[in-house]
A protein has these predicted regions:
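Histidine- and aromatic-enriched segments that form or immediately flank copper-ligand environments
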Residues: 25, 29-150, 235-265, 285-300
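Residue-level detector of functionally pivotal "anchor" positions at catalytic/ligand-binding pockets or at interdomain
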Residues: 309-325, 331, 338
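Asparagine-centered strand-capping/turn motif at beta-strand->loop junctions
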Residues: 79-83, 228-232, 335-337
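Acidic-aromatic/histidine active-site loop/patch
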Residues: 49-50, 166-220, 229
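Glycine-centered tight-turn motifs at strand-turn-strand junctions
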Residues: 354-372, 389
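C-terminal tail/sorting-segment detector
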Residues: 373-390
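Short, glycine-anchored, charge-dense loop/turn motifs used at functional sites
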Residues: 347-355, 376
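Short strand-edge motifs at loop-to-beta-strand transitions and within beta-strands
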Residues: 65, 114-118, 214, 263, ...
Length: 390
């Protein structure tokens, strides 16, 4: 999957008692975003972008930058309104006081070219949302939203303290456009009826999700964390392959009384589920996402996200007869290709970001990998293998 834009700067302040950590982000609002549709045409959108000093950008993203904290962190979100209209940031599901709730008339609207610092303490693990709460019907529909992830206070790769660690993590944020609104937004109104006609996962739709950059990748007998969230106006149904074990541990930023194992999950507007997904077999399949109108339950769209579970032993021979060694890798990875055809290889980080790619020629190959130390996925047309780079 395409990585969610990381913000570049945070400040950690440890008190003399060793407890308090302040994590800061800088966001801006703009109303000049250009979104490329699946068919190659473009529409306008409004959104949030990185505003980190000393060199803030001038772009907004769909969805907005993901904000990540740990339980007990003191969060500070510095917000600048670089647009001609009022905007706010409302932190949906997070426990914040009224002054920091981002609901205009009960806290404050942020005027054009003005700033505001949102401050709150992170008290619960889970997945949360943020969005503009000025003329919410329009501003949210135009793309002014993003996600917040709060992890365990100990920094572990788990959904919550005491749960198993996961090897990789993915977000599946559902949303929709009514393209008529994006073509001709009217503020403050009147509005015509919102009719969802363009469905997205993480701001992408249709074939945009099928190019290999947005696959959910994992290994046999390992856990994948999948964070489901719905910021749209309809019901979204996520259907997972039946040979996956899918267990929900958190809902709306709270631990469930008992974990829920299921192959499908229905999410209503603003709802979130945090899942651990695993399998004891190799899988190359799709997560089907269906979108429904809340008024009449008519289906308004669908998307499909590839999910691939592979072997975790890099020294094994894959379906093409390729053999890789050694594991861990120290600079050079060797590969023997017994066929007379070249084979594409791709190296992914565990968050799904494509790091390096090339071709494996017939015979013995020496692959020079330019990576930071850590764990990676090697993808070929017929396999998905995990390796460690020292």
């Amino acid at each position: 999957m395409k990585s969610i834009l990381p913000l570049l700067l945070f400040l950690s302040i440890f008190s003399i008692y060793g407890q308090t950590t302040t994590v800061e982000y800088w966001l801006q609002a703009r109303m000049n975003g250009v979104y490329e549709l699946e068919n190659g045409s473009s529409v306008q959108f409004w959104g949030y972008g990185d505003n980190t000093p000393p060199n803030p950008g001038n772009k907004v993203f769909l969805p907005g930058p993901q904000l990540r904290f740990k339980v007990e962190d003191s969060a500070v979100v510095h917000f600048k309104n670089n647009s001609p209209e009022m905007h706010t940031i409302h932190f949906h599901g997070l426990d914040v006081n009224q002054a920091n709730d981002g609901v205009g008339h009960t806290s404050q609207d942020i005027a054009p070219n003005q700033t505001f610092d949102y401050r709150f303490k992170c008290t619960n693990e889970g997945t949360f949302l943020y969005h503009c709460h000025v003329l919410t019907t329009l501003h949210l529909a135009m793309g002014m939203y993003g996600t917040v992830v709060v992890g365990p206070s100990n920094g572990s790769s788990s959904l919550s303290t005491g749960l198993p660690n996961y090897d990789s993590e993915y977000l599946m944020l559902s949303s929709e456009f009514d393209l008529d609104w994006n073509t001709n937004p009217i503020s403050p109104g009147p509005f015509h009826l919102f009719e969802a006609n363009y469905s997205m996962i993480n701001g992408l739709s249709g074939t945009q999700l099928q190019n290999g950059d947005h696959d959910i990748l994992g290994n046999v007998n390992s856990f994948i964390a999948i964070r489901l969230a719905n910021i749209g106006y309809g019901r979204t149904k996520f259907d997972f392959p039946s040979n996956l074990t899918v267990v929900a541990y958190l809902s709306d930023g709270r631990l469930l009384p008992s974990p829920i194992q299921a192959s499908s999950f229905d999410l209503y507007p603003g709802e979130r589920f945090d899942l651990l997904v695993s399998s004891d077999q190799i899988i190359d399949d799709l997560v089907a996402v269906s979108y429904y109108d809340l008024r009449n339950d008519n289906q308004t769209g669908s998307n499909f996200v590839p999910i691939k579970i592979g072997n975790n032993a890099l020294t094994s021979i894959d379906a093409n007869g390729l053999q890789f060694w050694p594991n861990p890798v120290q600079g050079v990875l060797y590969c023997n290709n017994p066929s007379n055809q070249s084979v594409l290889f791709q190296v992914y980080a565990l968050d799904g970001k494509l790091i390096q790619e090339g071709n494996i020629q017939p015979g013995l190959n020496t692959l020079q990998l330019e990576l930071l130390a850590g764990m990676y996925m090697m993808k070929t047309p017929q396999s998905l293998l995990k390796f460690i780079f020292d």
